[in-house]
Amino acid sequence: MPITSLEIKDKTFGTRFRGFDPEEVDEFLDIVVRDYEDLVRANHDKNLRIKSLEERLSYFDEIKDSLSQSVLIAQDTAERVKQAAHERSNNIIHQAEQDAQRLLEEAKYKANEILRQATDNAKKVAVETEELKNKSRVFHQRLKSTIESQLAIVESSDWEDILRPTATYLQTSDEAFKEVVSEVLGEPIPAPIEEEPIDMTRQFSQAEMEELQARIEVADKELSEFEAQIKQEVETPTPVVSPQVEEEPLLIQLAQCMKNQK
């Protein structure tokens, strides 16, 4: 067991003859005790410091181990992240290449489809254009034939009979008129003894005005039907037929009118 400063201070020595001076020994012991106490105190402080340093060293060792472990984990994580990023980048590049190839194929297909449709449309337009040209040629030929046929009708000699003056026409048709009137009335028509002059100032009766108005309406209707027939013949050519003068209906109407007046 180590000696303490108190034991040094309380230490007593036996005396002998011609021994050391007790006072000097006590003074020296006091000095030794003081220095020893200082040494013990310093040693204690150093032990405390050493302990503190050892604790700090242990703490730093733990931190070092933790940091080393963290570094290892970080390195491992970084390596795994790097590997995952590399794999992901490769996957992205591969997927992008596949998408680009797919888009390229789709673009080529659509371009070919558009080109095919454009070609088909161009062919269709060309065919339709040719059909329109053929129809135009047919229509032109029909129109030409119709116009020629109408011109032939207009230039026909039959129009001379139609366009003759009324007096001449009535004179040349007198016999036919008499026959029709005789047939309608059921009695022969006597020869006129003397022609009475036509009274241009005579006023028409209400019945005559209505009959005249009815005849005008009938004539307008026949004119409209004739114009419609001409228009239809222009659109759809028909064989050329020479105009025939329909004298009988008009003569019959006149004869009937005369019979009613009687």
From Swiss-Prot:
Coiled coil: 34-135, 199-236
Subcellular location(s) per record: Cytoplasm
Chief place where the protein resides: cytoplasm
InterPro entries per record: DivIVA_domain, DivIVA_fam
Keyword Cytoplasm: yes
Phenotype reported upon loss of the gene: Inactivation of divIVA results in severe growth inhibition and defects in cell shape, nucleoid segregation, and cell division, since it leads to the formation of chains of unseparated, morphologically altered cells with incomplete septa, often devoid of nucleoids. However, a further study showed that the anucleate cells observed in the divIVA null mutant (corresponding to 15% to 20% of the population) were indeed dead cells in the process of lysing.
Membrane-crossing residue ranges in chain numbering: none
Gene3D superfamilies membership: 6.10.250.660
Keyword Mitochondrion on entry: no
GO CC, one annotated term: cytoplasm
Post-translational changes noted in the entry: Phosphorylated on Thr-201 by StkP in vivo. Phosphorylation would regulate the scaffold DivIVA function directing cell wall synthesis and the formation of mature poles.
Keywords: Cell cycle, Cell division, Cell shape, Coiled coil, Cytoplasm, Phosphoprotein, Septation
Disulfide bridge map: none
Tree of life domain: Bacteria
Biological processes per GO annotation: division septum assembly; peptidoglycan-based cell wall biogenesis; regulation of cell shape
Phosphothreonine modification, residue list: 201
Description of how the protein assembles with itself and partners: Interacts with itself and with a number of cell division proteins, including FtsZ and Spo0J.
Known function: Appears to have a multifaceted role in controlling cell morphology, completion of cell division and separation, as well as chromosome segregation, through a complex interaction web. Seems to be primarily involved in the formation and maturation of the cell poles.
Family: Belongs to the DivIVA family.
PANTHER family tied to this protein: CELL DIVISION PROTEIN DIVIVA
Protein name: Cell division protein DivIVA
Taxonomic placement: Bacteria, Bacillati, Bacillota, Bacilli, Lactobacillales
